[in-house]
C-alpha cells in the first residue's frame, strides 16, 4: 500500500508540534498517532460577520494520521468565562454553546495501493471541511459542508504545503438567502514552516492557511459579496505538553459581507467592518 504520510509530511494538521508524550503508557483514551490539546484563547476584532467579535473561549483540538485517514478538527465553547464585547454571545448568555470545524481527508493513494504522485503533487485525497455553529436557534445557526479534492505538495524544502479545492453545500446560514443549496467554492492552501528548536526542549513553528471562497450567489443580495478571503498566520511555541500561540488573521469580505456597507439589525444603523486584522493569543496543554 502507499505509505501513509507522517504529521511532518502534511500541512493539513494545523497544530504541528512535538509528540505529546512517549509512546508507552498513554492510556485507554490516547494513542501514538492521535494528538489532542485544550487551549484557552483570547480573540480581538474577529470579522466573520459585519460586527467584529472579542471573546475568550475554550478550544479542544485534535490531529493525526492513521492508514488512509488524515484528521484535523476543533470544538470551541464560546465565551466560556463570560467575557466578550457587546457583539459577543456565548454559552452563558443565550448565544452559541458550540462552534466546531472538522477537516478529514482520505488518501486516494492509500486506497489505490500505489503512489499517484504527479510532479510535485505527492499524494491525493478526498477532502472535506465541515463547519457547524449551533447557535441559540435556527436563525442563529450555520451548517456548511465543503467537499472536494486535496493534495500534499513537495516543496523540496522545510515548508510543508497542502492544498484543497472544494464545492460548498450550505444548510443553515444565519438566515441568509443561500441556505439549503450548493453555493460556491473554496480554494484552500495550508503551509507549515519549522523555525527553530531550543535547548529547553521547546520548538517554534510558523503555521499558515488561507481560505478563498468564491462564486456565492450572496453577491446578489444587498451588502453581501460573492467572495471572501481569510488568511491566518500562527506562531506556535510548544513544549512536549505546554503550548503558546499568537495569531494574526486578515479578513477580506469576512462572512461574505461588504466592508463599509450600511446595515441595521434593529438596534440602529452601523457600517460593516468585514475587512481588516483580527488577533488571537492562547495557552494550551497537549496530551
Language-model-detected regions and their locations in the chain:
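Surface-exposed loop and membrane-interface regions of Gram-negative outer-membrane beta-barrel proteins
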Residues: 74-136, 224-228, 256-273
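Residues on the lipid-exposed face of transmembrane beta-strands in outer-membrane beta-barrel proteins
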Residues: 60-64, 102-108, 147-153, 165, ...
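Transmembrane beta-barrel outer-membrane domains
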Residues: 51-55, 93-99, 119-121, 138-144, ...
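Cleavable N-terminal export/targeting peptides
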Residues: 1-31, 286
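Short loop/turn motifs that connect adjacent beta-strands in outer-membrane beta-barrel proteins
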Residues: 22-34, 63-73, 108-125, 153-162, ...
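Outer-membrane beta-barrel "beta-signal"
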Residues: 273-287
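Transmembrane beta-barrel strands of outer-membrane/channel proteins
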Residues: 38-42, 73-77, 126-132, 163-169, ...
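Outer-membrane beta-barrel transmembrane domain signature
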Residues: 164-241, 252-259, 287
Amino acid at each position: 500500500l502507499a505509505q501513509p504520510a507522517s504529521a511532518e509530511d502534511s500541512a493539513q494538521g494545523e497544530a504541528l508540534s512535538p509528540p505529546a508524550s512517549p509512546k508507552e503508557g498513554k492510556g485507554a483514551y490516547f494513542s501514538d498517532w492521535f494528538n489532542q490539546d485544550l487551549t484557552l484563547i483570547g480573540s480581538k476584532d474577529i470579522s466573520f460577520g459585519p460586527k467584529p467579535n472579542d471573546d475568550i473561549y475554550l478550544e479542544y483540538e485534535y490531529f493525526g494520521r492513521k492508514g488512509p485517514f488524515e484528521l484535523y478538527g476543533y470544538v470551541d465553547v464560546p465565551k466560556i468565562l463570560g467575557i466578550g464585547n457587546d457583539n459577543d454571545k456565548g454559552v452563558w448568555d443565550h448565544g452559541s454553546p458550540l462552534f466546531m470545524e472538522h477537516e478529514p481527508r482520505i488518501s486516494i493513494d492509500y486506497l489505490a495501493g500505489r503512489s499517484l504522485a504527479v510532479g510535485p503533487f505527492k499524494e491525493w485525497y478526498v477532502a472535506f471541511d465541515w463547519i457547524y455553529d449551533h447557535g441559540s436557534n435556527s436563525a442563529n445557526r450555520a451548517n456548511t459542508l465543503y467537499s472536494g479534492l486535496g493534495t500534499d505538495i513537495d516543496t523540496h524544502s522545510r515548508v510543508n504545503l497542502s492544498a484543497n479545492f472544494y464545492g460548498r453545500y450550505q444548510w443553515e446560514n444565519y438566515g441568509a438567502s443561500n441556505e439549503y443549496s450548493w453555493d460556491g467554492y473554496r480554494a484552500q492552501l495550508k503551509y507549515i514552516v519549522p523555525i527553530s528548536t531550543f535547548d529547553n526542549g521547546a520548538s517554534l513553528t510558523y503555521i499558515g492557511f488561507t481560505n478563498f471562497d468564491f462564486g456565492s450567489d450572496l453577491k446578489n443580495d444587498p451588502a453581501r459579496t460573492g467572495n471572501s478571503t481569510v488568511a491566518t498566520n500562527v506562531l506556535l511555541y510548544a513544549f512536549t505538553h505546554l503550548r503558546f500561540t499568537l495569531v494574526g488573521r486578515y479578513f477580506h469580505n469576512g462572512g461574505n459581507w461588504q466592508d463599509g456597507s450600511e446595515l441595521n439589525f434593529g438596534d440602529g444603523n452601523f457600517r460593516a467592518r468585514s475587512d481588516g486584522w483580527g488577533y488571537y493569543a492562547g495557552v494550551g496543554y497537549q496530551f
